[in-house]
Amino acid sequence: MNTKEISKVVDLVRESNPLVHNITNVVVTNFTANGLLALGASPVMAYAKEEVAEMASIAGALVLNMGTLRPDEVEAMLLAGKSANRNDVPVLFDPVGAGATSYRTEVARHIPAEIELAIIRGNAAEIANVINEKWEIKGVDAGAGNGNVVSIAKQAADELNTVAVITGKEDVVTDGERTIVIRNGHSILTKITGTGCLLTSVIGAFVAVEKDYVKAAVAALTFYGVAAELAAAKTVEKGPGSFQIEFLNQLANTTSGDIEKYGKIEVI
């Protein structure tokens, strides 16, 4: 796998305009919708249990994000996820803050037990806690755990029968057999709330058009990281507000050629 091979997936997203059904958190809803629109996907935010199964059945991908947990949202996620499974719609799960509280951890482990996942995406602490491995956590952000990120990712992929994506300074994608590290991105992403949540939804748009989920995830992460680098080059000295606006611009303007030129991926 190389940057030339993955670079074309962004073109497929823009040509296909896939419908991405998000059951996400209240903090990031607007940013997520605008980011998907900028990319060229079509977002829908449908949360009511009365409609989520129907909406999920017609989507290109379903993204479940437990950032602001409520029991009614968990019920909606389970209904939507099972509908997506019945209709061969890929499901992505973002276990935000898994390990922070007992309830959050319980939900983070229950959803993969009930729903077949195409992708699970989180930081190292979150993924470790989903599979009951010890890792420090502070709020919804990764702590300074000492575990090996690649081994945690592989273990999660094997135990959950999915593609595991662990993001951080370097990003890891694995299905338990193929493992790729992506080294794009910029530290200013951590100064904007919701960039990780949007990333999961962007991966959803790529998964909707590329059925090799490892390739789709690597392409999405590389695209996202390159877009962040290009945005930071123009705005980082101005601050996170200017960066956020320019980042949306770059989600719209970053090309397959940019991915091929600036992407940094390594198969390990």
From Swiss-Prot:
UniProt cross-references to Pfam families, sorted A to Z: HK
Gene Ontology molecular-function annotations: ATP binding; hydroxyethylthiazole kinase activity; magnesium ion binding
This protein's UniProt keywords: ATP-binding, Kinase, Magnesium, Metal-binding, Nucleotide-binding, Thiamine biosynthesis, Transferase
Binding of substrate, residues: M45, G194
E.C. code: 2.7.1.50
CDD domains: THZ_kinase
Catalytic activities: 5-(2-hydroxyethyl)-4-methylthiazole + ATP = 4-methyl-5-(2-phosphooxyethyl)-thiazole + ADP + H(+)
Disulphide-bridged cysteine pairs: none
Top-level EC class as recorded in UniProt: transferase
Pathway annotation: Cofactor biosynthesis; thiamine diphosphate biosynthesis; 4-methyl-5-(2-phosphoethyl)-thiazole from 5-(2-hydroxyethyl)-4-methylthiazole: step 1/1
GO biological process, one term: thiamine diphosphate biosynthetic process
SUPFAM superfamilies reported for this sequence: Ribokinase-like (SSF53613)
Required cofactor(s): Mg(2+)
Positions that bind ATP: R121, T167
Family (UniProt): Belongs to the Thz kinase family.
Family annotation (HAMAP family): Thz_kinase
NCBIfam families: PRK09355.1, thiM
Function, as annotated: Catalyzes the phosphorylation of the hydroxyl group of 4-methyl-5-beta-hydroxyethylthiazole (THZ).
Protein name (record): Hydroxyethylthiazole kinase
Species this chain originates from: Bacillus anthracis
Gene that this sequence comes from: thiM
